[in-house]
Amino acid sequence: MTAKHAIDPFTVEVIKRALISAAEQMFVALGRTAKSSVIYEVLDHGCALTDAAGRMIAQANGIPAFIGVLGDAVRDVIGKFGLDGLDDGDILITNDPYMGGATHQNDAVLILPIFYGGEPVMFAASKAHWNDIGGKDPGSWSPSATDIYQEGIQFPVVKLFNAGEENRDIVDILARNGRIPEMTLGDMRAQAASLRVAARRVQKICNKYGLDTVLESIEVYLRQGRQEALAELRKLPEGVYEAEEYIDDDGLGGDPVRVKVAVTISDDEFVIDYTGTGPTCRGPINSPLSVVMSTAKFAYQSIVAPHADPNEGFFSPLRVIVPEDTVFNPKRPAPVSTYWESDAYAGDVVWRALAEAVPDRVTAGHFLSVCGTIVCGIDDAAGEWFISVEPNAGGWGAGRGKPGENGLVCSADGETYILSVEVAETRYPILVDQFALNVADGGHGRWPGGHGLIKDYRIANSQALVTASFGRNRYPPWGLAGGQDGTPNQAEVHRTDGSVERRGRFSSEILREGDVIRFITGTGGGYGDPNVRDPQAVLDDVLDGFVSIDAARAIYGVAIVGTPPRIDEEETASLRSSVH
């Protein structure tokens, strides 16, 4: 279908912005109507529009690993039902990690075909974290899972709504397979309603400009996306760039898992090859293929054109190679519920490979892990389940000319947030005893890494269960250009008897009233030789409590003396000259 006249570039841009706005309205509608704090506070969801072939044409800010998989999920719908098998008002659901829209079972994909003139012309798709969908542990995702069947119910692509009517059979199955069915069904209906918001917006756009003009504009701006990517790609240095890293272990305490990449940059292609990456793991850190492909997309965009509008055309120069039966491309029934513990490395190792080639676009390593947590149990006062799910923020790596950021969510989490103290204490039987910057020694450099966080949750219930998965607990964030490595992530249980347990993972650990779970996220890697950091900046760090006087002398070569503290310039010059 084509327009009857040439479309001017202004109309193309207006229609593109209108479609992006429709995706953003979908995102906001879901956040405002969901029942779970992991959606309305954390914003653990993503939304996008595709064309009738499943090509991504517009997205809202959200979790990067969600956006890239939604086109795959739409293509699964088309592959199963065909366009002729869809009716106006249908909404389809899938959460199967081994299908195209995969992450883990908690992340449900809902898809609505948008009809205009009696035909499906686009799709609205969203993915959101549902707090509990069954499985062996409350909250469903589990660091101790050994197969996918322990991680909750799985839906292949099925119709959740038939021509606008709820499929009661599917709804009943959902209600019987979760510990908090009213929360799950509330989130499901909010998600469905948000798709309808996007559909109405798209239909208004088609009414205003005409379907032919809208579809032709999409083709034009997809071509523009490819042209923009190629133009930026040609500014990058050609070559093959390699790196490798190690994931802490196989998810169950075994050996470290190798992650290897070779990035090939040419004038017309950006190839990410993960050949040499370690095998499928026993534990649940395996990443389904489509989420690794999505992570490769945002790593590619961050290097090629960070501020471009992402769409199928923009990503067309990217080619990703992922061998089968690896941690990045596992086989059913391998567990995947803490997939982020490997998937995050799919982006991180690309940045590490390119750090010297494009130093203005890459920072040192950051704390990397989602550092996901669940605090749950039967509320003593209400007699019902409570399940709090959230990520944790941490320290980012420094870049050339810029210190790292303090307390931001990891790269894979994108536009998400942690729970506020007020929401945590109001919604759940939790008291927040401490919420502070982690000033552990590490991440020093000419530009130091950003600080992680320390957060203490004291249990205000007779009993609670705590689950936590804090990857990068053995191998800290890497420094660049002479900067020092950062510090690892860690979780600790402090019991009322004075005992302390420190681990990278807890799985449904029983806590009693008064026990404290402490979440510690790492400091990012530093950039550049610490001995050339501006002495005044070092003094400021000392005054702020980020660097000790001893570390200022030993690491930065800055002598700080007196009360109030000041720089001894003569001794500083002597210290620094002895190093160089």
Task: Mark where each language-model region is.
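Glycine/proline-enriched, intrinsically flexible loops and inter-domain linkers
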Residues: 1-88, 93-580
